[in-house]
Amino acid sequence: MALIELRHVKKEFSGKAGKVTALKDIDLTVESGDIYGIIGYSGAGKSTLVRLLNGLETPTEGEVEIQGQDIALLPNKELRNFRKKIGMIFQHFNLLWSRTVLENIMLPLEIAGVPKQNRKSRAEELIKLVGLEGRETAYPSQLSGGQKQRVGIARALANNPDILLCDEATSALDPQTTDEVLELLLKINQELNLTVVLITHEMHVIRKICNRVAVMEYGEIVEEGKVIDIFKKPQTEIAKRFIQQEADKNIEETELVVEEMLEQYPNGKIVRLLFHGEQAKLPIISHIVQEYQVEVSIIQGNIQQTKQGAVGSLYIQLLGEEQNILAAIEGLRKLRVETEVIGNE
């Protein structure tokens, strides 16, 4: 069931030089209980989109519908109550430095008028959920970055929200702490059936826990789909760049090696293999060597784990009789391994 739906959303801001269009014709659907990623570089429109989702901005055109309500049409009082069902965490934590961990988590409940004893018991539950037992009386200055973000997550969950918006929530963290926070978000999603929307510029974050992703550029969603499908076959240049940064960090070196091997072995073929799921577990190289009497030189490869399974790419050179090479390529395709001849065709 769709929990969030954006239909033909446009957002303009007025400036000295005239109107600036931050979002153009955005269509987006997030299912209840999903972990949905939105990725883009700075200026793509991600932050504006977040502000539309929590009702801090209204669209110039189009509809932002959450739980069946067009939130732009809600009166102020109803909008304030509605916002209680949306939690949010940020890159820079936004904790009150004069309050302890427990007091920071109690803050939204205090604002909502929840009795003090109920506030305390709820905060203690959340401290246990996010793994901060024993740090209840610590102040933010005494916490690591990862612990501060855990406090931020607990505070965002205080009012039992249905949606958690994460705006660059791991950007200020080191890689290990990032993974720990992502694992916590995955745990919360599974245990509470909480819908999570992740805004990020890091493909690692998307790969690690998201089911679907929207790729944004210049205020538009240029590509959208299951994470594993985007990794398998990105359709846009920006999606390809994100995936290359994450999965193929030595792509320039690969291209140079391919050029050198094309010169050294003009009769062979350079082939890029892309495989996923069960194909990633198959002994593909030994199979084609034995079955088709070809020689295989491995240039470079990698396997990336997504939430929906492994995605691997491998650059190889096939050497041998022409008919054997062509048969090997056809055999790979029959195994449902996506095969692209990139040299010596």
From Swiss-Prot:
ATP binds at residues 40-47. The keyword Metal-binding does not apply. The keyword Transport applies. It is a peripheral membrane protein. Its main location: membrane. Its EC number is 7.4.2.11. Keywords: Amino-acid transport, ATP-binding, Cell membrane, Membrane, Nucleotide-binding, Translocase, Transport. One of its GO terms (cellular component) is plasma membrane. It comes from the Bacteria. It catalyses: L-methionine(out) + ATP + H2O = L-methionine(in) + ADP + phosphate + H(+); D-methionine(out) + ATP + H2O = D-methionine(in) + ADP + phosphate + H(+). Residues 4-243 form the ABC transporter domain. It is an enzyme of class 7 (translocase). Pfam families: ABC_tran, NIL. It is found in: Cell membrane. One of its GO terms (molecular function) is ATP hydrolysis activity. Belongs to the ABC transporter superfamily. Methionine importer (TC 3.A.1.24) family. The complex is composed of two ATP-binding proteins (MetN), two transmembrane proteins (MetI) and a solute-binding protein (MetQ). Part of the ABC transporter complex MetNIQ involved in methionine import. Responsible for energy coupling to the transport system. This is Methionine import ATP-binding protein MetN 2. The gene is metN2.
